[in-house]
Amino acid sequence: MDKYDKIIDLTKRRGFLWNSFEIYGGIAGFFDYGPLGAILKNNVINTWRKHYIVNEGFYEIDSPTVTPYEVLKASGHVENFTDPLVECKECLESFRADHIIEENVDVDTEGKTLQELQEMIEKNNIKCPKCGGEFKEVSTFNLMFATSIGPGGKRAAFMRPETAQGIFIQFKRISQFFRNKLPFGAVQIGKAYRNEISPRQGVIRLREFTQAEGEFFIDSRKKENFEKFESVKDMVLPLLPGKNQENESLSAEEKIVRMSLSDAVKNGVIAHEAIAYYVAVTKKFLMEIGIDESKLRFRQHLPNEMAHYAADCWDAELYTDRYGWIECVGIADRTNYDLLAHMKNSSEDLSVFVELDEDKEVEVYEIELNYKLVGRTFKGDAKILEESLKELNDKKMEELVEALETEGKYVLKTCKRDFEILKEYLTAKKVKKIVKGEKIIPHVIEPSYGIDRITYCVMEHAFKEEEDRTVMGFSNAVSPIKVGVFPLVNKEGMPEIAMDLKNKLRENGLIAEYDDSGAIGRRYMRMDEVGTPFCVTIDGETLTDRSVTIRERDSREQFRIPINEVVSYIKDKL
């Protein structure tokens, strides 16, 4: 058994991870979290919340997982959320083209085109691993789960491929919540869906998974000199820049550079201070949940692998024994791609007014409505038209004026109705005005975390085999059970004292587990195997001097303290 198999065996036995739908044979790409796994995962999530909501001042929203077709059409996912697919001509089994190549040839397929993948398959004579048959040509496969809303399937929809779109759709409401004062951030934690072609990497590649995503909205002019960057500028990180990845003369070790974030920004390795800051936040979070620092690196996306919405992107990659380096976090500069896309397709104004450092003179369009004609044409909706015209940005106003001049009419789409505006309905003229601010479309820095992959890596990095025990060395922040409480023997009132202490620990917010079965050494081993950092034993001395033995997991050190100090001692240590 390799390390992965040992961990999966332990997690199944001890209630961390189970195959979903197991009694029906299971389905690849789905896992259940058992009792301890659910606590572990939630502890990872709550630590993430602490970093982003408490420390960074983001606020959390919760939106539906079912998403209408038009939303994901506008976001670009309908066209771009794809993976390369190959299908066997003989048995018709499907595989991811890039994965099947990497399993047969020592080559990196990241960012390769369909044509390049096809050439690799042909050059290396790669066959179907199931039956040995030849493959059809490489094609694209959209990874979204399709569904419909309501009876009859008339309203097409998808299960969301990311949580981010829920934030972008509600941008106007979120901006109002923050009183339209940039910068501000919103987060969402929840399920996302990816109809993987052939998920054969256990818990690493799931079809239903949990994301924790933050969207930080900022004036694009503020990304270069980001106020918070000063606090992290000296942090040194292992970086794998795009130019080093493409330099074939460098060894794998030479491609990694350790440098401060300040130097990374100054030398153009990281695009700007804003994205560098959230790289630092990611490092802090991963260290707190127990990731092995020697198994962490930040890799820059190459231009040909960049997501359709991204200007720059850095992945936090974690090393695993079986699968090597895996992407667990993406920190992307999404620019204003999403807000612009949704503005265009919804006709809603998603801009924010920002004050200028000094007043400036600008030319703007001033509209005078022919109220008599507009009122006769649109009746009760005339007021809606008037307000909608006031909200048009400069670009939309230019479109309207040009259309009226060239075509004599313009269709204005609003959330209430569409208005066909004729030239005689209004007069538009340019006037000079002194303005104290302007409308902008904010840019977005997005830290996106794959919680399931991170949770698995927490388990693998914590897993240790010693001569006489197996230990899950979880950090205090994420360990599912905080304290094991044992009576040395099941008599003389020891079980009652132990049970009372367990209850007091739980009353103080600590998950404590009572165990009176077997030798004390066996009980310690059971707690070590699930990562419990402290064990407390009630023994004969407890009956005389009210002291107990505390045993620490990692050092195995044992010492005595008064029983009435146990709760405060453990809370301080955690």
UniProtKB/Swiss-Prot annotation:
Keyword check for Transferase, yes or no: no
- Cellular component GO terms, alphabetical: cytoplasm
Reaction equations catalysed: tRNA(Gly) + glycine + ATP = glycyl-tRNA(Gly) + AMP + diphosphate
Q: Which InterPro entries does this chain map to?
A: aa-tRNA-synt_IIb, aa-tRNA-synth_II, aa-tRNA-synth_II/BPL/LPL, Anticodon-bd, Anticodon-bd_dom_sf, Gly-tRNA_synthase/POLG2, Gly_tRNA_ligase_arc, GlyRS-like_core
Q: Which residues bind ATP?
A: 194-196, 204-209, 327-328, 450-453
* Localization annotation: Cytoplasm
Q: Which Pfam families match?
A: HGTP_anticodon, tRNA-synt_2b
What residue range is the signal peptide? none
Where does the chain bind substrate? Answer: R96, E162, F209, T210, Q211, A212, E213, E446, P447, S448, Y449, G450
EC identifiers of the protein = 6.1.1.14
Sorted UniProt keywords: Aminoacyl-tRNA synthetase, ATP-binding, Cytoplasm, Ligase, Nucleotide-binding, Protein biosynthesis
Any one GO molecular function term: ATP binding
Main location class: cytoplasm
GO BP annotations, alphabetical order: glycyl-tRNA aminoacylation
Family classification: Belongs to the class-II aminoacyl-tRNA synthetase family.
Q: What does this protein do?
A: Catalyzes the attachment of glycine to tRNA(Gly).
Q: Which HAMAP family match?
A: Gly_tRNA_synth_A
Can you name this protein? Glycine--tRNA ligase
Gene that codes for this?
glyS
